[in-house]
Amino acid sequence: MSIKVDITEPVTAVLDDAHIGHINGAFGTILHGDVAPRKTWKHRLTTLLAILGPGLIVMVGDNDAGAFATYGQAGQNYGTTLLWTLALLIPVLYVNQEMVLRLGAVTGVGHARLIFERFGKFWGAFSVIDLFLLNALTIVTEFIGIALALDYLGLDKTTGVIVSAALIMIAAGTGDFRRFERFAMALVFASLLLVPIYFMVHPPLAQVAHDFVFPQMPVGSKLSDVMLLVIGIVGTTVAPWQLFFQQSYVIDKRITPRFIRYERLDLWIGIALVIIGAVAIMAFTAATFAGQNEAGNFTDAGGIAVGIGKYVGRTAGVMFAIALIDAALIGASAVSLSTAYAIGDVFSARHSLHRKVTDAKGFYAVYGLLIAIAAAVVLTPGSPLGLLTLAVQTLAGVLLPSATVFLLLLCNDKPVLGPWVNSRWLNYFTSAVIAALVLLSIILTASVLFPDATNEQVIIDILVGGGLAAMIVALVAIALSGDAKGGRKAAINDASDAAALSRDTWRMPPLRQLAPAKLSLAAKTWMGVLRLYLVVAGGLVLFRIVMLAIGQG
Protein backbone atom coordinates (compact mmCIF):
# COMPACT_ATOMS: atom_id res chain seq x y z
CA MET A 1 0.00 0.00 0.00
CA SER A 2 1.40 3.39 -1.01
CA ILE A 3 1.14 6.40 1.28
CA LYS A 4 1.13 9.77 -0.44
CA VAL A 5 2.88 12.49 1.50
CA ASP A 6 2.93 16.13 0.50
CA ILE A 7 6.52 17.21 0.14
CA THR A 8 8.32 20.12 -1.43
CA GLU A 9 9.97 18.95 -4.62
CA PRO A 10 13.61 20.02 -5.01
CA VAL A 11 14.54 21.90 -8.15
CA THR A 12 16.19 19.37 -10.46
CA ALA A 13 17.75 19.18 -13.91
CA VAL A 14 15.00 16.99 -15.41
CA LEU A 15 14.60 18.12 -19.04
CA ASP A 16 11.16 16.68 -19.85
CA ASP A 17 8.30 17.21 -17.40
CA ALA A 18 6.91 13.82 -18.44
CA HIS A 19 9.79 12.38 -16.39
CA ILE A 20 8.15 13.60 -13.17
CA GLY A 21 5.16 11.79 -11.70
CA HIS A 22 3.98 8.36 -10.59
CA ILE A 23 6.21 5.34 -11.23
CA ASN A 24 3.96 3.23 -13.46
CA GLY A 25 5.80 -0.05 -13.81
CA ALA A 26 4.70 -3.24 -15.51
CA PHE A 27 3.83 -4.85 -12.17
CA GLY A 28 2.83 -1.97 -9.92
CA THR A 29 2.66 1.74 -9.15
CA ILE A 30 4.47 4.01 -6.72
CA LEU A 31 2.68 7.31 -6.24
CA HIS A 32 4.57 10.52 -6.81
CA GLY A 33 5.52 11.85 -3.38
CA ASP A 34 5.42 8.44 -1.69
CA VAL A 35 8.26 8.67 0.82
CA ALA A 36 6.91 6.22 3.38
CA PRO A 37 9.50 3.79 4.79
CA ARG A 38 9.20 0.20 3.55
CA LYS A 39 9.00 -1.58 6.91
CA THR A 40 7.36 -4.87 5.94
CA TRP A 41 8.48 -7.50 3.46
CA LYS A 42 5.16 -7.17 1.63
CA HIS A 43 5.67 -3.43 1.18
CA ARG A 44 9.24 -3.98 0.00
CA LEU A 45 8.12 -6.64 -2.47
CA THR A 46 5.39 -4.45 -3.98
CA THR A 47 7.93 -1.64 -4.30
CA LEU A 48 10.41 -3.94 -6.04
CA LEU A 49 7.72 -5.17 -8.43
CA ALA A 50 6.91 -1.59 -9.38
CA ILE A 51 10.59 -0.76 -9.93
CA LEU A 52 11.42 -3.91 -11.94
CA GLY A 53 12.14 -3.17 -15.57
CA PRO A 54 15.21 -1.12 -16.49
CA GLY A 55 17.77 -3.66 -15.31
CA LEU A 56 15.90 -6.65 -16.70
CA ILE A 57 15.28 -5.06 -20.10
CA VAL A 58 18.82 -3.75 -20.62
CA MET A 59 20.42 -7.03 -19.58
CA VAL A 60 18.14 -9.44 -21.43
CA GLY A 61 18.18 -7.05 -24.39
CA ASP A 62 21.92 -7.58 -24.44
CA ASN A 63 21.32 -11.28 -25.19
CA ASP A 64 20.24 -10.22 -28.68
CA ALA A 65 20.67 -11.81 -32.10
CA GLY A 66 24.38 -10.97 -32.13
CA ALA A 67 24.82 -12.60 -28.74
CA PHE A 68 23.10 -15.78 -29.95
CA ALA A 69 25.64 -15.97 -32.76
CA THR A 70 28.65 -15.20 -30.56
CA TYR A 71 27.77 -17.61 -27.75
CA GLY A 72 26.74 -20.22 -30.31
CA GLN A 73 30.07 -19.88 -32.10
CA ALA A 74 31.90 -20.40 -28.81
CA GLY A 75 29.90 -23.54 -28.07
CA GLN A 76 30.06 -25.04 -31.56
CA ASN A 77 33.77 -24.36 -32.09
CA TYR A 78 35.23 -24.75 -28.58
CA GLY A 79 32.66 -26.58 -26.48
CA THR A 80 32.14 -25.18 -22.99
CA THR A 81 35.79 -24.19 -22.45
CA LEU A 82 35.01 -20.44 -22.69
CA LEU A 83 32.14 -20.39 -20.20
CA TRP A 84 34.47 -18.79 -17.62
CA THR A 85 34.46 -15.56 -19.64
CA LEU A 86 30.82 -15.09 -18.67
CA ALA A 87 31.63 -15.47 -14.97
CA LEU A 88 34.36 -12.82 -15.23
CA LEU A 89 31.95 -10.41 -16.89
CA ILE A 90 29.39 -10.49 -14.06
CA PRO A 91 31.13 -7.83 -11.89
CA VAL A 92 31.91 -5.75 -15.00
CA LEU A 93 28.26 -5.75 -15.99
CA TYR A 94 27.10 -4.78 -12.53
CA VAL A 95 29.64 -2.00 -11.98
CA ASN A 96 29.06 -0.37 -15.36
CA GLN A 97 25.28 -0.53 -15.21
CA GLU A 98 25.08 0.43 -11.54
CA MET A 99 26.97 3.62 -12.32
CA VAL A 100 24.55 4.62 -15.08
CA LEU A 101 21.45 3.79 -13.07
CA ARG A 102 22.87 5.98 -10.31
CA LEU A 103 23.52 8.78 -12.79
CA GLY A 104 19.98 8.50 -14.13
CA ALA A 105 18.22 8.48 -10.77
CA VAL A 106 20.30 11.30 -9.28
CA THR A 107 20.66 13.65 -12.26
CA GLY A 108 17.48 13.19 -14.28
CA VAL A 109 19.60 13.89 -17.38
CA GLY A 110 20.67 11.41 -20.05
CA HIS A 111 24.19 10.18 -20.65
CA ALA A 112 24.84 12.06 -23.89
CA ARG A 113 23.64 15.39 -22.49
CA LEU A 114 25.89 15.04 -19.45
CA ILE A 115 28.87 14.43 -21.72
CA PHE A 116 27.96 17.57 -23.69
CA GLU A 117 27.66 19.66 -20.54
CA ARG A 118 30.72 18.38 -18.67
CA PHE A 119 33.21 17.62 -21.46
CA GLY A 120 32.28 20.01 -24.25
CA LYS A 121 30.75 19.96 -27.71
CA PHE A 122 33.44 17.81 -29.32
CA TRP A 123 32.94 14.86 -27.00
CA GLY A 124 29.19 15.42 -26.85
CA ALA A 125 28.85 15.35 -30.63
CA PHE A 126 31.20 12.39 -30.80
CA SER A 127 29.15 10.41 -28.28
CA VAL A 128 25.86 11.02 -30.12
CA ILE A 129 27.20 10.43 -33.63
CA ASP A 130 29.04 7.22 -32.76
CA LEU A 131 26.04 5.97 -30.77
CA PHE A 132 23.73 6.66 -33.70
CA LEU A 133 25.95 4.92 -36.26
CA LEU A 134 26.80 1.92 -34.09
CA ASN A 135 23.20 1.46 -32.98
CA ALA A 136 21.92 1.68 -36.56
CA LEU A 137 24.29 -1.12 -37.56
CA THR A 138 23.39 -3.14 -34.46
CA ILE A 139 19.68 -2.96 -35.31
CA VAL A 140 20.48 -4.34 -38.76
CA THR A 141 22.06 -7.38 -37.09
CA GLU A 142 18.84 -7.86 -35.08
CA PHE A 143 16.82 -8.11 -38.27
CA ILE A 144 19.42 -10.44 -39.76
CA GLY A 145 18.68 -12.71 -36.80
CA ILE A 146 14.94 -12.45 -37.43
CA ALA A 147 15.45 -13.32 -41.10
CA LEU A 148 17.56 -16.38 -40.22
CA ALA A 149 14.93 -17.62 -37.76
CA LEU A 150 12.13 -17.10 -40.28
CA ASP A 151 14.07 -19.09 -42.88
CA TYR A 152 14.38 -22.01 -40.46
CA LEU A 153 10.69 -21.86 -39.59
CA GLY A 154 9.78 -21.85 -43.29
CA LEU A 155 8.03 -18.48 -43.08
CA ASP A 156 8.19 -15.70 -45.65
CA LYS A 157 11.12 -13.44 -44.76
CA THR A 158 9.68 -10.25 -46.21
CA THR A 159 6.37 -10.55 -44.40
CA GLY A 160 8.01 -11.60 -41.15
CA VAL A 161 10.55 -8.76 -41.11
CA ILE A 162 7.87 -6.16 -41.90
CA VAL A 163 5.55 -7.52 -39.20
CA SER A 164 8.41 -7.54 -36.67
CA ALA A 165 9.32 -3.94 -37.49
CA ALA A 166 5.69 -2.86 -37.18
CA LEU A 167 5.32 -4.64 -33.84
CA ILE A 168 8.40 -2.89 -32.42
CA MET A 169 7.12 0.52 -33.56
CA ILE A 170 3.58 0.00 -32.30
CA ALA A 171 4.72 -1.26 -28.89
CA ALA A 172 6.62 1.97 -28.20
CA GLY A 173 4.19 4.38 -29.84
CA THR A 174 1.10 4.01 -27.65
CA GLY A 175 1.96 6.89 -25.33
CA ASP A 176 1.62 4.52 -22.38
CA PHE A 177 4.91 3.74 -20.59
CA ARG A 178 3.41 0.83 -18.66
CA ARG A 179 2.10 -0.76 -21.85
CA PHE A 180 5.55 -0.69 -23.44
CA GLU A 181 7.18 -2.07 -20.31
CA ARG A 182 4.72 -4.95 -20.20
CA PHE A 183 5.53 -5.71 -23.84
CA ALA A 184 9.25 -5.64 -23.04
CA MET A 185 8.83 -7.77 -19.92
CA ALA A 186 6.87 -10.35 -21.91
CA LEU A 187 9.89 -10.59 -24.22
CA VAL A 188 12.16 -10.85 -21.17
CA PHE A 189 10.25 -13.82 -19.78
CA ALA A 190 10.03 -15.40 -23.25
CA SER A 191 13.83 -15.46 -23.28
CA LEU A 192 13.60 -18.19 -20.65
CA LEU A 193 12.63 -20.48 -23.52
CA LEU A 194 16.36 -21.20 -23.69
CA VAL A 195 16.15 -23.10 -20.38
CA PRO A 196 13.92 -25.97 -21.59
CA ILE A 197 16.13 -26.27 -24.69
CA TYR A 198 19.07 -26.76 -22.33
CA PHE A 199 17.28 -29.62 -20.57
CA MET A 200 16.17 -31.15 -23.88
CA VAL A 201 19.80 -31.27 -25.03
CA HIS A 202 20.97 -32.16 -21.46
CA PRO A 203 24.67 -31.19 -21.62
CA PRO A 204 26.78 -32.61 -18.76
CA LEU A 205 26.02 -30.35 -15.79
CA ALA A 206 29.27 -31.12 -13.95
CA GLN A 207 31.36 -30.12 -16.97
CA VAL A 208 29.33 -26.94 -17.47
CA ALA A 209 29.78 -25.96 -13.82
CA HIS A 210 33.52 -26.70 -13.94
CA ASP A 211 34.14 -24.68 -17.10
CA PHE A 212 32.09 -21.78 -15.76
CA VAL A 213 34.29 -21.52 -12.66
CA PHE A 214 37.77 -22.52 -13.85
CA PRO A 215 39.41 -20.51 -16.67
CA GLN A 216 41.06 -22.47 -19.45
CA MET A 217 41.86 -22.18 -23.15
CA PRO A 218 40.67 -24.72 -25.74
CA VAL A 219 43.35 -27.37 -26.24
CA GLY A 220 44.91 -27.43 -29.70
CA SER A 221 43.21 -24.24 -30.85
CA LYS A 222 44.87 -21.21 -32.40
CA LEU A 223 45.36 -18.57 -29.71
CA SER A 224 44.59 -15.67 -32.02
CA ASP A 225 41.24 -17.16 -33.05
CA VAL A 226 40.29 -17.90 -29.46
CA MET A 227 41.28 -14.42 -28.27
CA LEU A 228 39.20 -12.78 -30.98
CA LEU A 229 36.18 -14.81 -29.91
CA VAL A 230 36.79 -13.87 -26.26
CA ILE A 231 36.81 -10.24 -27.35
CA GLY A 232 33.58 -10.87 -29.23
CA ILE A 233 32.00 -12.27 -26.07
CA VAL A 234 33.09 -9.20 -24.12
CA GLY A 235 31.82 -6.83 -26.82
CA THR A 236 28.53 -8.68 -27.03
CA THR A 237 27.99 -8.74 -23.28
CA VAL A 238 29.16 -5.20 -22.46
CA ALA A 239 27.96 -2.78 -25.16
CA PRO A 240 27.94 1.06 -25.28
CA TRP A 241 24.21 1.32 -26.00
CA GLN A 242 23.45 -0.29 -22.63
CA LEU A 243 24.90 2.71 -20.78
CA PHE A 244 22.78 5.23 -22.67
CA PHE A 245 19.62 3.10 -22.54
CA GLN A 246 19.52 2.29 -18.85
CA GLN A 247 20.31 5.83 -17.71
CA SER A 248 17.53 7.28 -19.87
CA TYR A 249 15.05 4.51 -19.12
CA VAL A 250 15.53 4.96 -15.37
CA ILE A 251 14.78 8.66 -15.89
CA ASP A 252 11.73 7.96 -18.06
CA LYS A 253 10.40 5.54 -15.44
CA ARG A 254 10.74 8.38 -12.89
CA ILE A 255 12.97 6.45 -10.52
CA THR A 256 14.60 8.74 -7.94
CA PRO A 257 17.51 8.19 -5.51
CA ARG A 258 15.08 6.93 -2.89
CA PHE A 259 14.59 3.74 -4.92
CA ILE A 260 18.15 3.11 -6.11
CA ARG A 261 18.47 0.09 -3.80
CA TYR A 262 15.50 -1.54 -5.52
CA GLU A 263 16.84 -0.67 -8.97
CA ARG A 264 20.14 -2.31 -8.06
CA LEU A 265 18.25 -5.50 -7.23
CA ASP A 266 16.42 -5.21 -10.56
CA LEU A 267 19.83 -5.04 -12.22
CA TRP A 268 21.09 -8.12 -10.38
CA ILE A 269 18.02 -10.08 -11.49
CA GLY A 270 18.67 -8.96 -15.07
CA ILE A 271 22.31 -10.04 -14.85
CA ALA A 272 21.22 -13.44 -13.54
CA LEU A 273 18.88 -13.91 -16.49
CA VAL A 274 21.41 -12.80 -19.09
CA ILE A 275 24.08 -15.15 -17.68
CA ILE A 276 21.61 -18.04 -17.52
CA GLY A 277 20.70 -17.44 -21.15
CA ALA A 278 24.32 -17.10 -22.29
CA VAL A 279 25.42 -20.24 -20.42
CA ALA A 280 22.47 -22.17 -21.82
CA ILE A 281 23.26 -21.19 -25.43
CA MET A 282 26.95 -22.02 -25.13
CA ALA A 283 26.31 -25.28 -23.28
CA PHE A 284 23.52 -26.75 -25.40
CA THR A 285 25.26 -25.70 -28.62
CA ALA A 286 28.43 -27.45 -27.44
CA ALA A 287 26.51 -30.61 -26.56
CA THR A 288 24.53 -30.56 -29.80
CA PHE A 289 27.56 -30.46 -32.09
CA ALA A 290 30.00 -32.50 -29.98
CA GLY A 291 31.41 -35.29 -32.14
CA GLN A 292 29.50 -34.14 -35.22
CA ASN A 293 30.89 -32.98 -38.56
CA GLU A 294 29.69 -29.42 -37.90
CA ALA A 295 31.79 -29.11 -34.73
CA GLY A 296 34.33 -26.33 -35.21
CA ASN A 297 32.58 -25.05 -38.33
CA PHE A 298 30.25 -22.31 -37.12
CA THR A 299 28.26 -20.45 -39.78
CA ASP A 300 25.52 -18.38 -38.14
CA ALA A 301 22.61 -18.57 -35.69
CA GLY A 302 20.48 -20.16 -38.39
CA GLY A 303 23.01 -22.97 -38.65
CA ILE A 304 22.65 -23.59 -34.91
CA ALA A 305 18.88 -23.93 -35.30
CA VAL A 306 19.40 -26.40 -38.14
CA GLY A 307 21.87 -28.41 -36.05
CA ILE A 308 19.59 -28.52 -33.03
CA GLY A 309 16.70 -29.63 -35.23
CA LYS A 310 18.88 -32.33 -36.81
CA TYR A 311 20.47 -33.80 -33.69
CA VAL A 312 17.98 -32.96 -30.91
CA GLY A 313 14.63 -32.69 -32.61
CA ARG A 314 12.41 -30.37 -34.62
CA THR A 315 10.68 -29.05 -31.50
CA ALA A 316 13.95 -27.90 -29.96
CA GLY A 317 15.00 -26.29 -33.25
CA VAL A 318 11.72 -24.39 -33.49
CA MET A 319 12.04 -23.24 -29.88
CA PHE A 320 15.55 -21.93 -30.60
CA ALA A 321 14.31 -20.03 -33.66
CA ILE A 322 11.48 -18.48 -31.64
CA ALA A 323 13.93 -17.52 -28.89
CA LEU A 324 16.15 -15.91 -31.54
CA ILE A 325 13.25 -13.80 -32.83
CA ASP A 326 12.36 -12.84 -29.26
CA ALA A 327 15.96 -11.79 -28.59
CA ALA A 328 16.09 -9.72 -31.78
CA LEU A 329 12.81 -7.97 -30.94
CA ILE A 330 13.87 -6.87 -27.47
CA GLY A 331 17.34 -5.97 -28.72
CA ALA A 332 16.02 -3.82 -31.56
CA SER A 333 13.54 -2.09 -29.23
CA ALA A 334 16.13 -1.24 -26.58
CA VAL A 335 18.88 -0.18 -28.99
CA SER A 336 16.49 2.08 -30.94
CA LEU A 337 15.20 3.62 -27.73
CA SER A 338 18.71 4.36 -26.48
CA THR A 339 19.34 6.40 -29.64
CA ALA A 340 16.02 8.25 -29.56
CA TYR A 341 16.48 9.07 -25.87
CA ALA A 342 20.00 10.41 -26.48
CA ILE A 343 19.01 12.68 -29.35
CA GLY A 344 15.95 13.99 -27.52
CA ASP A 345 18.04 14.60 -24.42
CA VAL A 346 20.77 16.51 -26.25
CA PHE A 347 18.32 18.80 -28.03
CA SER A 348 16.04 19.20 -24.98
CA ALA A 349 13.17 17.83 -27.06
CA ARG A 350 10.32 15.83 -25.61
CA HIS A 351 11.57 12.28 -25.26
CA SER A 352 9.38 10.01 -23.20
CA LEU A 353 7.33 6.87 -23.65
CA HIS A 354 4.72 8.61 -21.50
CA ARG A 355 4.01 10.90 -24.46
CA LYS A 356 1.94 10.06 -27.52
CA VAL A 357 3.48 10.21 -30.98
CA THR A 358 1.87 13.59 -31.71
CA ASP A 359 3.38 15.00 -28.51
CA ALA A 360 6.97 13.82 -29.15
CA LYS A 361 7.28 13.62 -32.93
CA GLY A 362 11.07 13.86 -33.09
CA PHE A 363 11.58 11.17 -30.47
CA TYR A 364 9.33 8.67 -32.21
CA ALA A 365 10.61 9.66 -35.66
CA VAL A 366 14.17 8.70 -34.70
CA TYR A 367 12.95 5.46 -33.13
CA GLY A 368 10.81 4.46 -36.10
CA LEU A 369 13.34 5.55 -38.72
CA LEU A 370 16.07 3.36 -37.27
CA ILE A 371 13.77 0.34 -37.27
CA ALA A 372 12.50 0.99 -40.80
CA ILE A 373 15.97 1.49 -42.29
CA ALA A 374 17.34 -1.64 -40.62
CA ALA A 375 14.44 -3.75 -41.89
CA ALA A 376 14.83 -2.31 -45.40
CA VAL A 377 18.57 -3.06 -45.46
CA VAL A 378 18.01 -6.71 -44.53
CA LEU A 379 15.31 -7.07 -47.20
CA THR A 380 17.42 -5.41 -49.91
CA PRO A 381 19.02 -8.02 -52.19
CA GLY A 382 22.79 -7.84 -52.26
CA SER A 383 23.16 -5.95 -48.97
CA PRO A 384 26.60 -6.63 -47.43
CA LEU A 385 25.17 -8.18 -44.27
CA GLY A 386 28.41 -9.96 -43.37
CA LEU A 387 30.37 -6.72 -43.70
CA LEU A 388 27.84 -4.87 -41.55
CA THR A 389 28.14 -7.51 -38.82
CA LEU A 390 31.94 -7.17 -38.91
CA ALA A 391 31.61 -3.38 -38.69
CA VAL A 392 29.38 -3.65 -35.61
CA GLN A 393 31.78 -5.94 -33.75
CA THR A 394 34.83 -3.85 -34.60
CA LEU A 395 33.33 -0.42 -33.90
CA ALA A 396 31.89 -1.65 -30.60
CA GLY A 397 35.34 -2.82 -29.59
CA VAL A 398 36.88 0.53 -30.51
CA LEU A 399 34.23 2.68 -28.81
CA LEU A 400 33.59 0.74 -25.60
CA PRO A 401 36.71 1.97 -23.74
CA SER A 402 35.79 5.61 -24.43
CA ALA A 403 32.25 5.07 -23.15
CA THR A 404 33.61 3.60 -19.92
CA VAL A 405 36.08 6.47 -19.48
CA PHE A 406 33.26 9.03 -19.70
CA LEU A 407 31.23 6.97 -17.26
CA LEU A 408 34.07 6.89 -14.74
CA LEU A 409 34.69 10.63 -14.99
CA LEU A 410 30.99 11.50 -14.64
CA CYS A 411 30.68 9.31 -11.56
CA ASN A 412 33.49 11.29 -9.93
CA ASP A 413 31.98 14.69 -10.81
CA LYS A 414 31.01 16.37 -7.52
CA PRO A 415 28.44 18.85 -8.90
CA VAL A 416 26.75 16.05 -10.84
CA LEU A 417 26.46 13.31 -8.21
CA GLY A 418 27.14 15.04 -4.90
CA PRO A 419 27.07 12.37 -2.17
CA TRP A 420 26.57 9.67 -4.80
CA VAL A 421 30.07 9.89 -6.34
CA ASN A 422 32.12 6.70 -6.69
CA SER A 423 33.99 5.12 -3.84
CA ARG A 424 37.76 4.74 -4.05
CA TRP A 425 37.64 0.98 -4.62
CA LEU A 426 34.99 1.32 -7.30
CA ASN A 427 37.34 3.70 -9.13
CA TYR A 428 40.17 1.19 -8.85
CA PHE A 429 38.04 -1.60 -10.26
CA THR A 430 36.58 0.49 -13.08
CA SER A 431 40.03 1.73 -14.07
CA ALA A 432 41.25 -1.86 -14.27
CA VAL A 433 38.25 -2.68 -16.46
CA ILE A 434 39.12 0.23 -18.75
CA ALA A 435 42.70 -1.03 -19.06
CA ALA A 436 41.45 -4.50 -19.99
CA LEU A 437 38.96 -3.08 -22.50
CA VAL A 438 41.66 -0.99 -24.15
CA LEU A 439 43.90 -4.05 -24.55
CA LEU A 440 41.06 -6.11 -26.00
CA SER A 441 40.08 -3.23 -28.26
CA ILE A 442 43.63 -2.97 -29.61
CA ILE A 443 43.74 -6.71 -30.31
CA LEU A 444 40.35 -6.58 -32.05
CA THR A 445 41.33 -3.55 -34.13
CA ALA A 446 44.63 -5.16 -35.12
CA SER A 447 42.89 -8.38 -36.14
CA VAL A 448 40.55 -6.53 -38.49
CA LEU A 449 43.22 -4.29 -39.98
CA PHE A 450 45.93 -6.93 -40.31
CA PRO A 451 44.23 -10.35 -40.28
CA ASP A 452 47.29 -12.13 -41.65
CA ALA A 453 49.65 -10.59 -39.10
CA THR A 454 47.56 -11.20 -35.97
CA ASN A 455 49.21 -14.33 -34.62
CA GLU A 456 49.94 -15.61 -31.16
CA GLN A 457 53.13 -13.59 -30.76
CA VAL A 458 51.43 -10.32 -31.72
CA ILE A 459 48.68 -10.94 -29.17
CA ILE A 460 51.19 -11.82 -26.46
CA ASP A 461 53.18 -8.67 -27.25
CA ILE A 462 50.05 -6.55 -26.94
CA LEU A 463 49.08 -8.15 -23.64
CA VAL A 464 52.57 -7.76 -22.17
CA GLY A 465 52.95 -4.22 -23.44
CA GLY A 466 49.59 -3.41 -21.95
CA GLY A 467 51.10 -3.78 -18.50
CA LEU A 468 52.59 -0.32 -18.86
CA ALA A 469 49.20 1.09 -19.75
CA ALA A 470 47.71 -0.63 -16.71
CA MET A 471 50.23 1.11 -14.47
CA ILE A 472 49.24 4.47 -15.93
CA VAL A 473 45.59 3.60 -15.39
CA ALA A 474 46.31 2.83 -11.74
CA LEU A 475 47.82 6.29 -11.28
CA VAL A 476 44.76 7.84 -12.89
CA ALA A 477 42.52 5.85 -10.56
CA ILE A 478 44.39 7.15 -7.53
CA ALA A 479 44.00 10.72 -8.74
CA LEU A 480 40.31 10.24 -9.44
CA SER A 481 39.65 8.53 -6.13
CA GLY A 482 41.20 11.46 -4.33
CA ASP A 483 38.86 13.83 -6.14
CA ALA A 484 35.91 11.59 -5.36
CA LYS A 485 36.76 11.43 -1.68
CA GLY A 486 36.90 15.18 -1.53
CA GLY A 487 33.63 15.35 -3.44
CA ARG A 488 31.83 13.20 -0.93
CA LYS A 489 33.09 15.25 1.99
CA ALA A 490 32.21 18.51 0.29
CA ALA A 491 28.74 17.31 -0.57
CA ILE A 492 27.97 16.04 2.89
CA ASN A 493 29.50 18.95 4.81
CA ASP A 494 27.92 21.73 2.75
CA ALA A 495 25.76 23.41 5.38
CA SER A 496 24.09 25.64 2.79
CA ASP A 497 22.41 22.64 1.21
CA ALA A 498 20.47 20.58 3.74
CA ALA A 499 19.37 18.15 1.05
CA ALA A 500 22.96 16.99 0.65
CA LEU A 501 22.74 15.42 4.09
CA SER A 502 20.33 12.82 2.72
CA ARG A 503 21.36 10.65 -0.19
CA ASP A 504 17.71 9.71 -0.71
CA THR A 505 16.70 13.28 -1.55
CA TRP A 506 19.82 14.73 -3.18
CA ARG A 507 19.29 15.56 -6.88
CA MET A 508 21.54 17.32 -9.34
CA PRO A 509 20.54 20.98 -9.73
CA PRO A 510 19.57 22.38 -13.16
CA LEU A 511 22.39 22.24 -15.68
CA ARG A 512 22.69 26.02 -15.87
CA GLN A 513 23.43 26.14 -12.14
CA LEU A 514 26.26 23.62 -12.22
CA ALA A 515 29.76 24.84 -11.54
CA PRO A 516 32.01 24.41 -14.59
CA ALA A 517 33.64 21.02 -14.83
CA LYS A 518 37.19 21.04 -13.48
CA LEU A 519 39.21 18.20 -14.92
CA SER A 520 42.34 17.13 -13.09
CA LEU A 521 45.62 16.76 -14.95
CA ALA A 522 45.12 13.00 -14.93
CA ALA A 523 41.65 13.35 -16.43
CA LYS A 524 42.91 15.74 -19.11
CA THR A 525 45.64 13.25 -19.95
CA TRP A 526 42.99 10.54 -20.25
CA MET A 527 40.98 12.69 -22.65
CA GLY A 528 44.00 13.50 -24.81
CA VAL A 529 45.11 9.89 -25.10
CA LEU A 530 41.53 8.82 -25.74
CA ARG A 531 41.12 11.33 -28.55
CA LEU A 532 44.35 10.18 -30.21
CA TYR A 533 43.39 6.52 -29.88
CA LEU A 534 39.93 7.07 -31.35
CA VAL A 535 41.25 9.10 -34.28
CA VAL A 536 43.86 6.48 -35.18
CA ALA A 537 41.86 3.31 -34.49
CA GLY A 538 38.58 4.67 -35.83
CA GLY A 539 40.23 5.98 -38.99
CA LEU A 540 42.05 2.72 -39.69
CA VAL A 541 38.93 0.63 -39.09
CA LEU A 542 36.87 2.86 -41.36
CA PHE A 543 39.54 2.59 -44.06
CA ARG A 544 39.60 -1.20 -43.74
CA ILE A 545 35.81 -1.46 -43.99
CA VAL A 546 35.76 0.75 -47.10
CA MET A 547 38.46 -1.40 -48.70
CA LEU A 548 36.45 -4.54 -47.97
CA ALA A 549 33.32 -2.92 -49.37
CA ILE A 550 34.99 -2.14 -52.70
CA GLY A 551 36.58 -5.56 -52.87
CA GLN A 552 40.17 -4.57 -52.20
CA GLY A 553 40.45 -5.79 -48.59
Named regions from a protein language model:
Residues 225-228, 425-490, 531-538, 544:
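A generic transmembrane alpha-helix motif of multi-pass inner-membrane proteins
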Residues 30-36, 70-75, 97-123, 178, ...:
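Flexible loop linkers connecting adjacent transmembrane helices
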Residues 128-132, 152-173, 193-194, 361-373, ...:
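Transmembrane alpha-helical segments of multi-pass small-molecule transport proteins
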Residues 58, 85-118, 126-133, 137:
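Juxtamembrane transmembrane-helix boundary signature
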Residues 121-122, 158-163, 269, 315, ...:
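Loop-to-transmembrane helix boundary motifs in multi-pass membrane proteins
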Residues 189-217, 227-247, 406-414, 437-448, ...:
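Hydrophobic alpha-helical segments and their helix-loop junctions in multi-pass secondary transporters
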Residues 92-106, 250-251, 272-303, 548:
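Extracellular/periplasmic helix-exit of transmembrane alpha-helices
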Residues 186, 355-365, 390-449, 486-489:
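C-terminal membrane-solvent junction of multi-pass transporters and transport-like membrane proteins
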